[in-house]
Amino acid sequence: FIGELSLGRTPNPCVICNRFLKFEQMFKFARDFGCSKVATGHYARVRHGKDGSWSLLKGRDRAKDQSYYLSFLKNSWLSKILFPIGGFEKSEIYKMAQKEGLDFLVGKKQSQDLCFVDDKLRRTFIDKRLRPQSGKILSVDGEALGQHEGSHNYTIGQRKGLDISDGQGPYFVVGFDGDDVIVSRDEKDPSLYSNVVNLRNVNLASLADLDSGASISVMAKIRYQQKLSRAKLTISGKSGKLEFSSPVRAVTKGQIAVFYKGEVCLGGGIIK
């Protein structure tokens, strides 16, 4: 996470954590205890096809669907995973919990992003592990609007916390130039939009393979909260490209793009 920030990227720790920490460690524990499967409380599902294939599916509760965060799971793992609540609405799970006397779980605050660091301590945690480089906050025309204490505190499309007090805002982060942060007053600045998103470290959670250079039509998104948009996916090895039918806003290096076919989460890749 810190390494990605130091390279000027905005990482998604949850996706990487699920792949390399949570599930890998759970499978190790399962083997040690002689268990053949692991179960988690994610709102997602797995499906065993008639042809023997396994697919990762969206959770039934689409508002709480977490397949996005599971897009980097290995396809070979799906046969060993159980998602017992994936076929329920969250409201149904709460009712079950209350019925079993687990009221303390209902309404419990959900962890977001860096679950291992309190939101109030996030900046301190990062600054202790990085050597922040101060720089200027510049308008798209090159006008100096302020100073910052580290470009890692900013991301494409960001509006709040920009430390600009000229009274002319709001401003939006549209890019970086070395240690300088570039902002625009135009929420629809052209530099915020792109039809093409290039990917690295592509993972196919529900596709055992895809012919190199072949293209398929998918629905995709470049962040969890974004609505799915039509796109053409082309994969070559671990690299990929999404060509969206309509421009998508705030394409951010280090974030995860995830692609779907119907309710099947095909996989994802890191935006480069």
Protein language model annotation of sequence segments:
Residues 1-265, 270-272:
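Nucleotide-activated chemistry modules centered on ATP-dependent adenylation/adenylyltransferase
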